Amino acid sequence: MKLLFELSKDGNISVPALSKKLGISASVLYSRIKRLVKKKLIKKFTMEIDDSLLGIGVKASLGINRDPKFKIQIHKALLEITEVVSIVEVTGRFDTMIRVYAKDLEDLHSVVIEKIGKIECIQNTETFVELQKTDKELTYLNKNT
């Protein structure tokens, strides 16, 4: 678990640096990482992007109610919208939640009204604009410390 915790904090850390941090040999560590990848416990090594440098100034979640018979068609239509970055089926007052990244509030408004709002069989939406975000480390991976 310590290995996964450290990799979740920095997937780009070198094997020698990580082996020193964890107190195990680099060859053993390399074998463990390969095994975790093979078992698909580690799906991918990724990076964190500063979205603001790409012109993304507004992030929002949208709750969507839709006709259940048209779930697949609605998902396909949503995936064609560049600003939609994820789609999640949920329980509760919405059927679906999506994440939208936009340049600014005007752009977000345009995406919600002109693109998402025009998809057939979407009954209604509610937009939640992200004001501040704080990510927590994956502490469940760090139980042994």
Language-model segments: what does each one mean?
Residues 1-145:
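A compositional/biophysical signature of low hydrophobicity enriched in polar/charged and small residues
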